[in-house]
């Protein structure tokens, strides 16, 4: 009896620590819920039951187990109607107000996804003044919650934060890439868009992966994570635990990812890492059939201490390779957005809009031509008469600029030494002829295959050309 009494007392103390009914910061005023889905609300309470009552439907009552509860709430079709949800137990209640039903996306990565609209460290975001000035127009169309930087040894459930409504003040602090992505989506779909932003500048992909996957790839996760010389943002699984686990399973349409600059030295394994990361994330969201699209962004060209180096384009190759490994994925081309001296290009609107174009066609049935959505890809190269004749994909309507030298090409002969070359577009064809007086008999051609080199080749709908090498 004494043991039973002691056990009951300890259990009572544990439950009393929870106190009144509570929900994580993810479930708060101004939030957006994914339309036509089941959103799993969760929280704590010291009572037997909790009721979740949405303004659009019947209340759902669930049992509390060990102080915790979960309730699946079905959401209606998207609209601009303002909703509320009441979460209550026998003694207390939480009101979640100004709630919208729309489209939700999880946006993650390193600094080019994290970079706020206001810019950072003397590096601006193009058009930020105009974008922020007009932000209040989208108060009922866009909402964003940004998770604070946090690393953790184990998966976390909660974080400090709140859903923000766009205004000239709040928009400046929002992820510029994610905001422009949301802006393009809400304009095209005429629906509310919610963004869950979870990024950390300078982070390596290993920090976002599962420990099991990393160990299978040969990582000694315990040694790496106990090494004080390795920053947490580069240690194994630390950022998944701190930034993704707290929103794990939150109903969303898909993912947008902008990362890779911190993995230039391990480009040979990056495609497999991407494949494993995406599979793990989808599994944690209960998506075993790859229904949630994974959209990701080519790292931007940047000199990286050596403009002539090839570390960046090799990582870009791995990003392209990952497309073949990852079902329902898409890659945004950024060859034309890079800046030689800044790793954070200002053209965040371009990146956000290109992400949106992929989402619109892939998720929402918007009929956009391939040339408007996909970056231009190398198809083949033929060598004859002292020149390379290069044919491209995703350029059905031709290439531009016509009649001007095309920058960014290089040719090599049998010696394997590459020299700058000039390209000329073959009129009305997705073909460029490339020649160089320094290479009378070329056997290999490259385009934009340096950490940074000026380029100017696009298709007629403005999509840039992915870096490539014919001698891979």
What do these predicted ranges mean?
Residues 20-472:
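Cell-envelope and extracellular/periplasmic
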